[in-house]
Amino acid sequence: MARIAGVDIPNDKRVVISLTYVYGIGLATSKKILAAAGVSEDIRVKDLTNDQEDAIRREVDAIKVEGDLRREVNLNIKRLMEIGSYRGIRHRRGLPVRGQNTKNNARTRKGKAVAIAGKKK
């Protein structure tokens, strides 16, 4: 298994797919990385030469991925909560942030439904 940005990427898959195992790299970014590194998308990870691996590593190192990206996202959410913006308040209360209705659904964000004692009559 090749190791890129601290992540073991699978050997038996195509490089374009294997790169998406790194947090912060999707299919579009993966294709851009391979084009910049001059590596074919169809080649398998196990068939990469050391020079090709190094070229891919250099391109990935130029992008914010894995721990750095997770840290930045968490700091952005913390900043929203500290300044008291609407989105920050929704994050703090554990409610949907992007305008979804909460009357009936939003169970993923709100958690399991809790019964209220004495409600039924």
Swiss-Prot record:
Ranges of Basic residues composition bias in the record: 106-121
One term under GO cellular component: small ribosomal subunit
One of the GO biological process terms: translation
Pfam families reported in the protein's UniProt record: Ribosomal_S13
Role this protein plays: Located at the top of the head of the 30S subunit, it contacts several helices of the 16S rRNA. In the 70S ribosome it contacts the 23S rRNA (bridge B1a) and protein L5 of the 50S subunit (bridge B1b), connecting the 2 subunits; these bridges are implicated in subunit movement. Contacts the tRNAs in the A and P-sites.
Matching NCBIfam families: uS13_bact (TIGR03631)
Region span, Disordered: 95-121
Protein family membership: Belongs to the universal ribosomal protein uS13 family.
Classification via SUPFAM superfamilies: S13-like H2TH domain (SSF46946)
Subunit composition and interactions: Part of the 30S ribosomal subunit. Forms a loose heterodimer with protein S19. Forms two bridges to the 50S subunit in the 70S ribosome.
InterPro entries: Rbsml_uS13_C, Ribosomal_uS13, Ribosomal_uS13-like_H2TH, Ribosomal_uS13_bac-type, Ribosomal_uS13_CS
Source species, domain of life: Bacteria
GO molecular function: rRNA binding; structural constituent of ribosome; tRNA binding
Designated name of the protein: Small ribosomal subunit protein uS13
Protein keywords: Ribonucleoprotein, Ribosomal protein, RNA-binding, rRNA-binding, tRNA-binding
